[in-house]
Amino acid sequence: MALKSFNPITPSLRELVQVDRTSLWKGRPFKALTKGISKTGGRNNQGRITSWQRGGGHKRLYRVIDFKRNKLDISAIVERIEYDPNRTAFIALIKYEDGEHAYILAPQKLVVGDKIISSKDADIKIGNCLPLRYIPIGTTLHNVEMKVGKGGQIARSAGTSVDLVGKDSGYAQIKLKSGEFRLVPLDCMATIGTVSNPDQKNINLGKAGRNRWLGWRPHVRGVAMNPVDHPHGGGEGKTSGGRHPVTPWGFPTKGKKTRKNKRTSKFIIKKRK
């Protein structure tokens, strides 16, 4: 997909850069694979704000994506490639030989009419899904499971992928885009290829209102608040905070490591950069 810029006939169009989506499906989503999704506005079940700067945004339909790809040894045809407002990647509607439909993450270079399959005997071809045990070292993958049967969790965002760099003692070694090397059980499923829409990282929203459409509210700096609202607040005139950057609750931020899950640290061979 190419990027699209605009003539500056309005101020917001001057900086606007979008992904050209003219080749995507222009109709409604497949109704049987959609369901309603309610907005939280950043509030939890007690009505308290747990995620700042969230709220509003355009109403969305949730597309049910098959991250497990566990319909084995039945080939499917790609019927169309669609936009999904709930994620940065594009999605593909596929139809199996038995008539069942499903949405999957669309990898790059997958086109309408392609035939894909989930099977341990599948060819190493874009869109096919196999257990890591049967994938050759050096293959580029996405939608990789971390637990057998749980569904893909690694490399699902636009333009992302992982590299299979080794196999040993029942585990596959994968290299993530972050530079992290990780162990994953060999029976976990993974899909061949890189996730679609790699130009997502180059877009420019052009105006604040476009962020509001996506459900993001203004981000207020701590130094612009009062002392009652933030540790950086207050002071006479414009002050720079006077301490190392912290969250509204006083915890160090901007680079402070927050990973707490020591239980799975044994699966990380090399930490991310």
From Swiss-Prot:
One of its GO terms (molecular function) is rRNA binding. It comes from the Bacteria. It holds the Pfam family Ribosomal_L2. One of its GO terms (biological process) is translation. Keywords: Ribonucleoprotein, Ribosomal protein, RNA-binding, rRNA-binding. Residues 228-273 are annotated as: Disordered. The keyword Oxidoreductase does not apply. One of its GO terms (cellular component) is large ribosomal subunit. PROSITE patterns: RIBOSOMAL_L2. Residues 254-273 have a biased composition (Basic residues). One of the primary rRNA binding proteins. Required for association of the 30S and 50S subunits to form the 70S ribosome, for tRNA binding and peptide bond formation. It has been suggested to have peptidyltransferase activity; this is somewhat controversial. Makes several contacts with the 16S rRNA in the 70S ribosome. Belongs to the universal ribosomal protein uL2 family. Part of the 50S ribosomal subunit. Forms a bridge to the 30S subunit in the 70S ribosome. This is Large ribosomal subunit protein uL2.
